[in-house]
Amino acid sequence: MVNDLSNDLSNAALTPAERAPRPIAAGVDIGHVHLKTADIDRVHDFYVGVLGFDVIARMPSALFLSAGGYHHHLGFNTWESAGGSPPPPGTTGLYHVAIRYPTRAALGDALRRLADAKWPIDGASDHGTHEAIYLRDPDQNGLELAWDRPESDWPRDAEGRLRSERAAPDLADLLAAADDL
């Protein structure tokens, strides 16, 4: 399934595979993600203590976090989920949230933070367009921590379409890049 998606993405280039009859406005982006959590303190310790997000607001049943002063990039609440368990495998729902870092050094710093916290990593990949680290948060939500290469460096075929790549990244080199911060 993932390979099918990679093939579909590689053929899409930067032109949609299917254009909506009434396309959404260019420039629309995802402003924030709001997730249910079993434990506000536990997600606070991970997202603030390990990844380094700033707390914008904290209440007994909700937490709002930001990277760089936005009103919030991530929201968490226990309104319907306090003490709950993650959804079982084989059900629909969130696959992962990608957190994009501005530089390779910043992604290397994130990897260092995870290593320092002894946080388990599910995998890592160099996709050609970006490098990514995959992991699970305390509620078992999938996270992709990623750095996008400049678009001019993205791999393309002879017709100019994006090529999907999946290679093992040099994690030691990525960690060393954090020294540039």
Question: What does each model-identified segment do?
Answer:
Residues N7-A13, D54-T91, G142-R149:
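Conserved short beta-strand elements that form part of the metal-binding/catalytic scaffold
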Residues D39-D54, R113:
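Amphipathic alpha-helical segments
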Residues M1-G27, A158-L181:
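Short acidic N-proximal helix/loop "leader" segments that mark the beginning
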